[in-house]
Amino acid sequence: MQHDSRNISMLMDFYEMTMAHGYFTKQEKMDRVAFDVFFRRNPDKGGFAIFGGLEQIVEYILNLHFDERDIAYLRDQGIFSDEFLDYLKEFSFTGDVYAFPEGSIIYPNEPVITIVAPLIDAQIVETAVLTMMNHQSLIATKANRIVRAADGRVVADFGARRAHNVDAAVYGARAAYIGGVASTATVLAGQQFGIPVSGTMAHSWVMYYGSEYDAFKAYAEVYPDNAVFLVDTYDVLNSGVPNAIQVAKDVLEPMGKRLKGIRLDSGDLAYLAKKARRMLDDAGLQDCKIMASNSLDEYTIKSLLLQGGPIDIFGVGERLITSKSDPVFGAVYKIASVEKDGKWEPRIKISEAVEKITNPGLKKVYRVYNEKGRAIADLLTLLREVPDTAEPYRYINPEQPWRELYFENCTFKEMKELIIKDGKLIKELPSLEEIRQYVKDQLTNEIWPEEQRFENPHRHYLDMSPSYYQLKLDLLNRIYRKK
């Protein structure tokens, strides 16, 4: 687990602290509660999302503390008691954290993270937990869409300079690697997370030398094993590609080396790639790769390939690192249960908008698989329930509760794992490579191709056990009877 040396314990909305002070003042700080983290819709109208950011969430929670500078700042606000500030001086997180494994394919309205902890502990982590999950889940999901659109071709992250800040660049590169990109141009991310780094030259290199031939020659002499030339500084077809070919013949081939690639960063990429490919092939450079960049995303990549653009590598920047087409993931943090006198009481938030009614109580999430290992649904159950696989299992589709529905010949996998117990890490977290491979394995073996479509993907349902559905119905009826 990578360590962030910064103390970011004050990364919270101010109301987290005002509520914490209120709970402390009312002697309720040690009441145990459960909060669920979930999201309501898939980005870009896709069929699923990818869970990212868990490692950073765990690190934040394990290192949560308030130093003298934090206490002094809070005292200066003039609304917090000395007793509360003394309590914060000794504070550390003492609760439990349950979560899906990082890299899991996730779906709307299921609790991806559940925090069970004393009231103050659970309340003050809300903002940071959401910040980390929202950002990395969004970028991992976007990266995976781009990688799938590239259809086996290499995708590289070029996004740092268009990211919204330094953390967005570095952790965005981490999330993009989880989503499937092959490398990043962000050196700090490579150093911090072990992500392969890639990059060759900018237009400034070509412009400094004055002529493309001299620029390419100089680069080839320094990097004969990794000669990739940027060919669009002046004129791709009349200058850039011809000079790249000439340097390959004059400099690289006498050294026994080959031109590794050219990069197109502007213009009609499909047209230019076709013309450049023909020129390279005619010069005996059939093994030279063509890289394209310039505001690419899954939609432009699919279009380029549909046009027959012979592009081998895509460098993707701003539309990946900002998820430009759908830049908000929208995970929320909602209380689900409160412990009173040793018994857990479920809580539910209701709304005029049906999709914003929460799923109450302590619960399990199971992924349901058919005989071939394909995931056919996710299932919410009461905490005590274990699905019986020996016979057909009845379930409720909450949108059509009158239907008699059964899972037959299916297996059930519980998705949430206990990661932190009583404030201590009890489960070793996977490496970044393991997380990345987990994503690939799920998409290859478990998730239906129909869910991976870009247009009108199949919907993966979140069903309920009859007992859990009845719990939710009883709570709704009780609340509406009180109105």
Features from the language model and the residues they span:
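A short helix->loop->beta-strand "cap" motif at the edges of active sites that frequently abuts
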Residues: 288
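Gly/Ser/Thr/Ala-enriched C-terminal appendages of enzymes
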Residues: 1-31, 44-46, 283, 296-483
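An N-terminal, globular interaction/scaffold subdomain
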Residues: 59-63, 99-101, 106
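Short hydrophobic alpha-helical runs that function as membrane-insertion/retention elements
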Residues: 199, 291, 312-315
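Short coil/turn segments at secondary-structure boundaries
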Residues: 72-73, 141-145, 159, 451-457
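N-terminal, Lys/Arg-enriched amphipathic/low-complexity engagement segments
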Residues: 33-89
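Residue-level "edge-of-site" marker
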Residues: 203, 293, 317
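Buried, small/hydrophobic-residue-enriched core segments of structured protein domains
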Residues: 1-32, 41-43, 79-80, 85-94, ...
